[in-house]
């Protein structure tokens, strides 16, 4: 079995996602940056004909060295799959353990989960992840804590 963190496995997965149309024209889409040192860029959105009322959305989140996302929740209808593209990401969903995921690793966040830690694990190197969300059409995908 191939190591999921190997460069060949990563290339296969990313190539497969590109072939599926998840990563398209990323450079031409607007970026949403927040003061904490991350930028989120929607790269794809598609209604799912086999799941009426559901939409798949792909977002690339880029973290500057030491950057982080503020605590947040995703819609109660949203399942989140996160795949680390580069660097290392420290993540914690409320009630769970803090974990560090490296390039090629992934995790799942259940609908409505409170994401209390999402940050670059390095203070010197950038990091990025691909978040793929499946949620109800029109759902507010991310709501930051006040």
Regions found by a protein language model. Give the residues of each.
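N-terminal secretory signal peptides and thylakoid transit peptides that target proteins
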Residues: 2-24
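A short beta-loop-beta micro-motif enriched in histidine and acidic residues
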Residues: 54, 68-83
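Glycine- and acidic-residue-biased ligand/ion/polar-headgroup-sensing regions
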Residues: 77-95, 105
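Short acidic-glycine-tyrosine-enriched beta hairpin
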Residues: 95-112
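Ligand-binding loop in jelly-roll beta-barrel domains
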Residues: 112-139
């Amino acid at each position: 079995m191939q190591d999921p963190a190997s460069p060949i496995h990563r290339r296969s997965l990313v190539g497969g996602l590109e072939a599926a149309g998840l990563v398209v024209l990323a450079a031409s889409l607007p970026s949403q940056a927040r003061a904490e040192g991350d930028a989120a860029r929607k790269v794809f959105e598609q209604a799912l004909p086999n799941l009426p009322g559901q939409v798949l959305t792909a977002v690339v989140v880029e973290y500057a060295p030491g950057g982080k996302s503020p605590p947040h929740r995703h819609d109660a209808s949203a399942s989140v799959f996160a795949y680390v593209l580069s660097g290392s990401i420290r993540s914690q969903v409320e009630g769970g353990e803090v974990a560090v995921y490296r390039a090629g690793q992934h995790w799942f966040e259940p609908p409505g989960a409170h994401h209390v830690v999402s940050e670059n694990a390095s203070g010197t190197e950038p990091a990025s992840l691909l978040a793929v969300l499946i949620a109800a059409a029109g759902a507010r995908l991310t709501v930051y804590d006040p």
